[in-house]
Amino acid sequence: MRKQWLGICIAAGMLAACTSDDGQQQTVSVPQPAVCNGPIVEISGADPRFEPLNATANQDYQRDGKSYKIVQDPSRFSQAGLAAIYDAEPGSNLTASGEAFDPTQLTAAHPTLPIPSYARITNLANGRMIVVRINDRGPYGNDRVISLSRAAADRLNTSNNTKVRIDPIIVAQDGSLSGPGMACTTVAKQTYALPAPPDLSGGAGTSSVSGPQGDILPVSNSTLKSEDPTGAPVTSSGFLGAPTTLAPGVLEGSEPTPAPQPVVTAPSTTPATSPAMVTPQAVSQSASGNFMVQVGAVSDQARAQQYQQQLGQKFGVPGRVTQNGAVWRIQLGPFASKAEASTLQQRLQTEAQLQSFITTAQ
């Protein structure tokens, strides 16, 4: 009888130990991934880019008797809980990624997300969202689920009692973004680099639309030689020597235009045939509506207008360039329905290999 009781006690102890280990591995209950039921929101923060995983910071580990398993599939991970704020001095500590800690960067520490990786952090109290780069482990020993740098906490306006939501952003090798953190979200590029303009010639053999691909360089006065002893502007054909027609999309300088030569005919038909103009038929078909298709954002207004005009001529739709802080958004539309905007999205993808998203006119 004593042996039977001893066996029962041992079995009960083993069962309790297993239950305790499982409890240690669990953290905060995982909410369902965000589902997009509204308009696309543009957020800023760290600029997500593809990075290989750190060789030493992505192994399962134990700390203070608690086991931690590294998240292998961030696409199935979301988490909500209280956020901590890491306020160490710059360079005072090394992160798990081997980098010196910098509180001015939009970074965060998480116990189990891959290093390095990116996540959208949402302040559930005020709705603010930013992108942070996960480059460290922690926090430990409290009920916090993530530790934010001071810069990230300030952008989100969080305190030590603020509840946040963590949604990973997955960066593919080609730079495309996916994952829970991209639901109803597009990330504003910090480099504002203009993508390579698509081939708008349709394979017809013309190179008129490929001219503006490079940056527009200033003309050096030292290369211009005037035959006029008074130093009058050069009147030969070329960029400053109109009347030679400029390539479509090329921007004229602010220099005064020389007097037209007698042999030049009045360019009365130029506005009607310029490829940068949107046809009246296209404008009348889509002049009203609340849906826009955004294809990019750049820091140069002139380049944004040039790019929008090229796309408008190619796809036969109106468009606009709007300012948002330091960048200029390139948008096509408006469209009366989201279905019409989606049709243009598909054409942009198949005919010009351009990524875009649908937004509402403001």
From Swiss-Prot:
Annotated compartments: Cell membrane
Chain intervals for the UniProt region annotation (Disordered): 198-276
Keyword Coiled coil among record annotations: no
Primary location: membrane
Lipidated sites in chain (S-diacylglycerol cysteine): C18
GO biological process, one term: cell wall organization
Domain of life of the native organism: Bacteria
GO cellular component: cell outer membrane; plasma membrane
Bilayer disposition of the protein: Lipid-anchor
A GO MF term: peptidoglycan binding
SPOR domain span: 285-361
Alphabetic keyword roster: Cell membrane, Cell wall biogenesis/degradation, Lipoprotein, Lyase, Membrane, Palmitate, Signal
UniProt keyword Cell wall biogenesis/degradation present: yes
EC number: 4.2.2.-
Function comment: Lytic transglycosylase with a strong preference for naked glycan strands that lack stem peptides.
Protein name according to UniProt: Endolytic peptidoglycan transglycosylase RlpA
Organism annotation: Escherichia coli (strain K12)
